[in-house]
């Protein structure tokens, strides 16, 4: 996982890590973790921090070493990449940029992708994703649909 990071990213993470490694022993406490991540432009919730810490701090000693920290940051960055990809995909479908994907927009994109859909098939796709029942797909519904695939 950490091998997908660039040298610049690793250097940046090392610098931030060192700032919070007060005694220079190569570990930071779980409490300091949130501060480190915020300094790198991430904004984890308390719940996300707990999950990350539990995943990383295998021995439960309350500290995280640099290799563990790198693995965790690589995971976090991978997650935000896929979020960006979903936003871009939504823009492709939302031709008029009104924040909704209509049946016509869905049919148009699917046709361009080589999928000739009947009226019923398009309606069915909209129905499956359309949580609030307004006949079109908003961004939240689109994200749910993409994540469930």
UniProtKB/Swiss-Prot annotation:
The gene is CMD1. Calmodulin mediates the control of a large number of enzymes, ion channels and other proteins by Ca(2+). Among the enzymes to be stimulated by the calmodulin-Ca(2+) complex are a number of protein kinases and phosphatases. This protein has four functional calcium-binding sites. This is Calmodulin. Ca(2+) 2 binds at residues 57, 59, 61, 63, 68. Ca(2+) 3 binds at residues 94, 96, 98, 100, 105. Residues 8-43, 44-79, 81-116, 117-149 form the EF-hand domain. It comes from Blastocladiella emersonii. Coiled coil: none annotated. SMART domains: EFh. The modification N-acetylalanine is found at residue 2. It comes from the Eukaryota. Belongs to the calmodulin family. Keywords: Acetylation, Calcium, Metal-binding, Repeat. GO terms for cellular component: myosin II complex. CDD domains: EFh (cd00051). Ca(2+) 4 binds at residues 130, 132, 134, 136, 141. Ca(2+) 1 binds at residues 21, 23, 25, 27, 32. One of its GO terms (molecular function) is calcium ion binding.
């Amino acid at each position: 996982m950490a091998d997908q990071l660039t040298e610049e990213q690793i250097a940046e993470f090392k610098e931030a890590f060192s700032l919070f490694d007060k005694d220079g022993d190569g570990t930071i406490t779980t409490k300091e973790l949130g501060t480190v991540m915020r300094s790198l432009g991430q904004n984890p919730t308390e719940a996300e921090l707990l999950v990350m810490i539990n995943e990383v701090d295998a021995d439960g000693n309350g500290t995280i070493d640099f290799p563990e920290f790198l693995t965790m940051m690589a995971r976090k960055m991978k997650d935000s990449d896929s979020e960006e990809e979903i936003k871009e995909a939504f823009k492709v479908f939302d031709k008029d940029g009104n924040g909704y994907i209509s049946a016509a927009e869905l049919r148009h994109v699917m046709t361009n992708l080589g999928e000739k859909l009947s009226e019923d098939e398009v309606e069915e796709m909209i129905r499956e994703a359309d949580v609030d029942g307004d006949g079109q797909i908003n961004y939240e519904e689109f994200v749910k649909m993409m994540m469930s695939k």
